Amino acid sequence: MAYDSAATRRRILTAAIAEFAAHGVAGARVDRIAENAQANKRAIYLYFGDKRALFAAVLEQQLSHIAETVPIDGDDLPGYAQRLVDYHTAHPETLRLLMWEALELGDSEVPAEAARTRHYQDKVDAVRAAEAGDDPQALVLFTLAIASYGFAMPQLRRMVLGTDYSPERLRDSIASAVRALGTK
């Protein structure tokens, strides 16, 4: 059977997502990634370079996935927020990776910062074009924050909302809050 480098690369990325989401960059171990990917460490270094470069590749993949799966609709920010809630429910690892990035890099430049900044500016432009709210930049930031905070801090969500606050109710409450923010 011929070696499938694309399949190996995918397995490495999948294993790296789980490893980095659980342990961050500093705590992640290339040995565990290789074992879980059924690959050797040499393949990781060959395809991705060092551990930080692998983390950057993981983030790029995850952020591309959320951007493709949940495009912004400047005319329907509450619906966009609900779709973000759905995404974070199905893919909690994405927020965990972003939180690890924030913890480990702080306010330093992040991988592919220029491209990521352009991506968020496109969101701001979509909100501005829809004439939603007085401050499109703040509205995008607040929408992203409201839609993700309860997933980034599940313990706080539980303490404030209790255990009987249904996911549907949370989703609807987030949409209502975003709707109120966008009201001129």
Tell me the role of every PLM-derived stretch.
Residues T14, G74-L103, Q137-L144, D172-R179:
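Amphipathic alpha-helical segments that line or abut small-molecule/effector binding pockets
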Residues A67, P71, G106-L141, E168, ...:
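Amphipathic alpha-helical packing segments from all-alpha helical-bundle domains
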Residues R11, A15-A53, A57:
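Helix-turn-helix
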Residues M1-A7:
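N-terminal intrinsically disordered/low-complexity leader segments
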Residues H88-A114, M153-L161:
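Amphipathic alpha-helical segments used for helix-helix packing
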Residues K51, V58, Q62, H91, ...:
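Hydrophobic/aromatic residues within well-ordered alpha-helical segments
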